[in-house]
Regions:
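Secondary-structure boundary elements
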Residues: 1-72
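Hydrophobic (often cysteine-bearing) scaffold residues that line and stabilize catalytic clefts
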Residues: 4, 25, 79, 83, ...
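Generic hydrophobic secondary-structure packing signal
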Residues: 25, 76, 113-115
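Residue-level recognition of well-ordered secondary-structure positions
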Residues: 30, 81, 92, 120, ...
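A short, highly charged nucleic-acid-interacting micro-segment common to nuclease
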Residues: 69-83
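Hydrophobic/aromatic-rich core segments of domains that either
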Residues: 81-156
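Low-complexity, Gly/Ser/Thr/Pro-rich intrinsically disordered linker/tail segments
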Residues: 141-184
Length: 184
């Protein structure tokens, strides 16, 4: 845990400069994480019942976790929950109000699982969506394309995305999430 925190602090120190606005901090963190993290398709396949698509021995599933911030100490391969957990830790360290949220998204090509994790950030008093997973192009250039960065919760790109209300505190959920985006 302590080692992970050191890595988080270093990411923030390298990406965030004094005097940056919260929006600039979010952009810098998104770029830094897109530059250093890779989507762990093997973990995704092994943990979503598609082990036949994985390029590893299913008995090695323990090596392919990808779900938490401590993956920064391994090979920087994560799935959506890892991206979101790491972004949350970095945003907190940078002084940006953020939330880790889960829910469902429309089915994606090659996927039989529509569960997903992403973040909300408070920028200029408004809670915006940041999805580092979908913002990381993973096309070999390790760059963020910015398409899922600080989106309004009603942005058409987010149509079909539903928040898991059970994972948010009822007493504060209305402070963060557009009610039309909550699961019944």
């Amino acid at each position: 845990r302590e080692e992970t925190y050191k890595v988080i602090k270093q990411i923030v120190a390298d990406a965030v400069q004094d005097g940056m606005s919260d929006a600039d901090k979010v952009k810098a963190l998104d770029a830094a994480l897109s530059n250093s993290l890779f989507y762990d398709w093997d973990s995704y396949y092994l943990n979503s019942g598609q082990g036949d698509k994985a390029d590893v021995d299913p008995m090695d599933v323990w090596k392919h976790r990808g779900y938490a911030a401590y993956e920064l100490l391994n090979d920087n391969r994560v799935v959506c929950s890892g991206y979101a957990a790491i972004f949350k830790a970095c945003a907190d360290e940078a002084g940006v109000k953020s939330l880790y949220v889960t829910g469902t998204v429309p089915p994606q090509p090659g996927s039989n699982n529509n569960g997903h994790a992403w973040n909300l950030v408070n920028v200029d008093g408004t809670w915006k969506v940041v999805d580092v997973t979908w913002d990381d192009t993973d096309q070999g250039d390790n760059q963020s394309d910015g398409q899922y960065l600080m989106l309004d919760q009603k942005d058409p790109k987010l149509d079909g995305r539903v928040y898991d209300k059970d994972a948010l505190l009822d007493s504060v959920v209305e402070d963060y999430v557009d009610p039309s985006r909550l699961a019944a």
